Amino acid sequence: MSRATGILAFGAYIPQRRLQRSAVYAANAWFAPGLKGQSKGERAIACWDEDTVTMAVEASRDCLTGLDRTAIAGISLASTTLPYADRLNSGLVKEALCLETNLTANDQTGSLRAGTSALIQALNGTTPQLVVAADLRKARPASEGELVQGDAAAAILVGQAGQGLGELAATFLGSHSVTIDFVDHFRSTSADFDYGWESRWIRDEGHTKILGGTLKEALTKLGVTGADIDHAIIPIAVRGVPESLAKSCGIKPEAVRDSLSAVVGDSGAAHPLLMLAAALEEAKPGDKILLAGFGQGADVLLFQATDSVGRPPEQLGVAGHLARARKDTNYTRFLFHRGLLDLEKGMRAEMDEKQPGTSLYRNRKAVMGLVGGRCTKTGTVQFPKTEIGVNANDRSQGTQEDYPLADKIAKIVTYTADSLSFSPDPPVYYGAIDFEGGGRLVAEFADCSAEDVEVGREMRMVFRIKAVDHARDFTKYFWKAVPVQKGDA
């Protein structure tokens, strides 16, 4: 008898800043007064140094807290906003997570249901697979999409019990998919923004007929009724549509999950998995969870929560990220960080950021994974790792072993706030930090203000964009330090 496959762990990442929709509407009301109906609530916005890859890394770290990463056999990254068309984006996530080299990696894109499709593909196997979905979409200013969308990522680890990754949190009961070239919106490879069709047609033909029909077919195929569903995840941002679809399938109203539209926004390919993570945090053993994905067809997956369901206390998850939200009303900064407003940067911004591929490859563990060195003779920890250690009392060669620092807590030793150097979000904070257990690094700080920074303040490391080589369209990544907040592991 084969062992059950399902969800072993889950995690999420939502940027701290929440742009108030009222601020967006206030700036654009003169031109688009019809947007008033969308002006309530807030949407999650990434900072200038975040993208699909960095958010995917943070969601994965949340998911894999306390787990043996060497057991993971594959990774998939689902997104409609991958930074590279010809470079394995999931490979970047793999390097940042310090996963084993002998695994499979693939990118899933081209549809907002890329996340659910990647999840089905992983669940149809037997080896531990990490499925990550993230999106950071651009929308034209004064458009409905600018108000409705949000930035986020979610990660789901699937596999079987007994693979060294704990017990199943939810058992996979089956899935059903249809593929139809229904073009509710599209974006070509050369375009920055989506082009969408009329909303009523999308609702009637797409949501009601295609997604609604797929939901009914899935319930029949999987041998359950709507009344059996305890959590219905229907990631459609249009008000009333999830409730209407659920009613047509016999699903009770209280089973329909909150879409997170008011506090996060529609996070694209990541949204079904983000809502799934939120449901798993609150589910009770035995609960049946129905997950849908929509985009040029539809996916429907069915899970049943086990006795191990719930969010481990050391993880932030969706609830933890929602709790640390920071309200933001600076619409101009949002436009600038999105590349939609060209501000005068001055001569200090005129730098050649070319990244030699040779040095990046040689130092990929240090740059991408923040792996330092620890001397096996003296125990001295340093970054970066070198052939000869920094301990003045022992200059032996070849005694250092790899020593990952990304998950270590550090404390500020010295710092400065630099208003002269160019930064997309001035002033730039940086300083020397000492890691618990040893090791010192001069690091740039992120997600902080003047009141967040002081000597002795605990910091944790996050994977971010270091700089962008605009001449060659190449993104340089590294690790930055952010203030530790309540709930951080």
Each language-model region and where it sits:
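Condensing-enzyme catalytic core mediating Claisen C-C bond formation in acyl metabolism
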Residues: 1-49, 143-205, 284, 291-360
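Short nucleic-acid-contacting surface segments enriched for D/E, G, S/T with interspersed K/R
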Residues: 447-461
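OB-fold/S1-family single-stranded nucleic acid-binding modules
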Residues: 462-489
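Short aromatic-glycine-enriched beta-strand elements
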Residues: 420-432, 476
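Conserved beta-ketoacyl condensing-enzyme motif
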Residues: 7, 52-113, 221-248
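Active-site pocket-shaping loop/turn-to-helix segments
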Residues: 39-58, 106-113, 145-147, 192-213, ...
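Claisen-condensing/thiolase-fold acyl-transfer catalytic domains that form or cleave C-C bonds
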Residues: 57, 82, 100-102, 107-128, ...
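Cys/His-rich short segments
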Residues: 348-414
